[in-house]
Amino acid sequence: MEYTILILLLPLLSFLVLGLGGKWMSHRTAGLIGTAVLGAVAVLSYLTAIHYFTAPRLADGTFATLMPYNCTWLPFTPTLSIDLGILLDPISVMMLIVISTVSFMVHLYSFGYMKGERGFQRYYAFLSLFTMSMLGLVVATNIFQMYLFWELVGVSSYLLIGFYYTKPAAIAASKKAFIVTRFADLGFLIGILVYGYYAGTYTFQPNEMALLKGGAAMIPLALGLMFIGGAGKSAMFPLHIWLPDAMEGPTPVSALIHAATMVVAGVYLVARMFPLFIEYAPSVLHIVAYVGAFTAFYAPQCGMCAERHQACTGILHYLPNRFHDGGAGCMYISRPTRRGTGLHGRHVPLIHTRHVQGIAVPRSG
């Protein structure tokens, strides 16, 4: 699957071309480039999924974990380094399908919806950057690489929410989203540093020698801090306050960022770290459950009590969007495995909800 690197490189190239040369392009040319690139990315993602899920399984019946690309980026010590690469397992392949499909549909829909808008080329450049960031996040081979793309997602969402930079409401909304998620991401970063110090690695499997020296006692703290970052990105209570105002961006952006992909990042983080939660921090999973369940109950009440003048998209995001929060809360009751979460029935509602709301939000706008 050597072509999987193109899933990241193509949207990055689209961002650079549209960002640097967009002002010399017509709206039609910029839209065609952005949409064609995401169409190619979607095709590559589906090919990756077909090849992965049809490949022979391991002896115990589980899917293999593949790393088509992996290289050392920052070698701190002989035993501790930060790598960059691509990780393919059932969760990451599933998310590639979700992100590439919804992103392609948003690019295609925006071609007509944003017709005649000032900054059309800039809009497509930001969409490509956001898509590349989300794709890089879900195929990260280690927590530090995930954090790098995590922050790129935050920056690109800030740019998209504030796309109408002449509107005071859009400027305020983009700042609010950026600041609130930065507080949450600070907890994520501290958790990563704690994990790397006591686990002896930044991969998703701790170093057994480091754990034998007493590092296991600090893993629950590290995972709890990481969950704060996930709660902020997925707009869980009490870090949900940025999401309604973020609808000040273009309506297709609301479908891409807040309804379909970005808000799933926190749930993906919990799913990716689920084996560690089960083995080293089962008590933290109770906190995840309480926060996710309360958010799933509280957010629809906010939608019902929303002010009458609030945009329909601002109300809609409260409702089916909360299914993923409930899924994060209930994830801990499913059968744990040391090998990982794999692709189970609990992921099916996540896939369906992302696609359904990715369609519903543009229709409401």
List each model region and its residues:
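...captures the hydrophobic TM-helix bundle architecture rather than a specific catalytic motif
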Residues: 1-365
